[in-house]
């Protein structure tokens, strides 16, 4: 179950990255906010149910992704524009109320009033007023920074440009959307999938006249930096200032009334003339809101009760299998394409062999497919009443479809997996992505597309091949390939060279061993201190029935280490890597905490003779220091090599201590002794 959850988490993160890039980076979202939020909600439920997989979460606390190559200036919000936590059932709402009451330490007879408001399916914005005058309008962006769309927002119907008796600084938030009628008029000339996409794309037009012609609407729902006592007062004042507000709102202290409001809205929403995707419940008291605060990405005082997911029936054309990074072999339903909730679906998850057998899924069946925040949709049922005699039972392969290794099922697990790990080509692509990730070797410029390119062209077959790439590229002219140029190739080679010096904990994590996330890798590295010690201990572990004790590490992690070192192909890759990398020793927690530079800011400048800049940086960080790229008043130490440049002059002017490379080496040795 844990491996399934980890695989699901990786898929959810991949999907979230994909949609964040489409929405925030390319202005071309494929899904609605509703569909995106379902992905976020499923991820939250998954992490709540399997807390042990949090260490594998490489896309945490995400609100959005900064827009690339933006045509609009980036601006900062007064306070972060966080996304809302989602509820899909009455039980979810009840749990939210319970959490809020517990957090506020309310007694059973204490009143907790809610504001129940429609959740618009549009694009969030903030409007900033100084002295009552509208000075800036911005998109939500990544929650902290958004795009300045002031010029275009000036033509939004009914958006006040001047407020009477407003606070000196006020930030009003709301949603830009498009009515169905206006969307239908637009559909003939523009290729937008739905009103939400049309609103998001229209407000980002470079031509203000086009924005005005699109007839966009908005609704305001909150005010930041205000002195109001309740959300009810905020909505009333927004209305008096002339903002468009949604009049379909309920204030109640009874959860039954809130749910009844939700049900009423759900059944009558088609008559609204615009899209909504749920009801938002907010704690009405602003004082309570301030006490509740927020998590990394969601306020604790609000939740979005989302409308049910959609299902559809289609034909199962075939069942294929795919091998993931950790070797799990997953069956995939190949479907007759069907439109579910505005998205064309042609593939769906069948989860595992047990699920196929339990549901008696056969090729040729009519299956029920559900989209409810899945990475890919899932097959939830089979319509056996229409089963024909020509359907076929699926035979799950006994060997890996990629490398031919015999598939293995571990006790207590339902997933079949290929245990070849580092030597299985199907796993190579995802393993290389993991290897170069931020918490691994952190190779900038070697992203998913570049890795896929090199794998498809036979230049990378395993993680060790990364460090032979420079040699292989000598005989290849990448300038003729799309997306490559002389500068990008040079930058990639430089990044690979820099990554050849790596801290032991990062190296262990980068290998992608099952159950060894960032935290576990650090525990292992701190226990053995050097690559040589760790390698020898693991080889000894495979030759005995004994086990090892590493503080904080569980049985599954130890067993996984033993299994990893029992595969000859893995040992060969390790031998190749250790010959090409400079794997730095890991400092103990005691060393980091007690070192003279712990918590201090260090800057390096000039050319170092005995080590690379990367190695020096890792040395400093391993001893608890913060490494900065520039000198400031907060800099504690400047390490100057030959030809130090302007940083040296600035350090002297700020009375920052300056030492040479030899003194730095001695300082590191003393800290580690």
From Swiss-Prot:
Cofactor requirement:
Mg(2+); Mn(2+)
InterPro entries named in the record: BRCT_dom, BRCT_dom_sf, DisA/LigA_HHH, DNA_ligase, DNA_ligase_AS, DNAligase_adenylation, DNAligase_N, NA-bd_OB-fold
Report the record's Gene Ontology biological process terms: DNA repair; DNA replication
Listed GO molecular functions? DNA ligase (NAD+) activity; metal ion binding
Q: Which UniProt keywords apply?
A: DNA damage, DNA repair, DNA replication, Ligase, Magnesium, Manganese, Metal-binding, NAD, Zinc
Q: Does the keyword Methyltransferase apply?
A: no
Among the entry's GO cellular component annotations, what is one? cytosol
Question: Which annotated residues bind Zn(2+)?
Answer: 400, 403, 418, 424
Catalysed reaction, written as an equation:
NAD(+) + (deoxyribonucleotide)n-3'-hydroxyl + 5'-phospho-(deoxyribonucleotide)m = (deoxyribonucleotide)n+m + AMP + beta-nicotinamide D-nucleotide
Q: Sorted alphabetically, which PANTHER family does this protein's record hold?
A: CHROMOSOME TRANSMISSION FIDELITY FACTOR 18 (PTHR23389), DNA LIGASE (PTHR23389:SF9)
Q: What is this protein called?
A: DNA ligase
Q: What is the lineage of its organism?
A: Bacteria, Pseudomonadati, Pseudomonadota, Alphaproteobacteria, Rickettsiales
Q: Which gene encodes it?
A: ligA
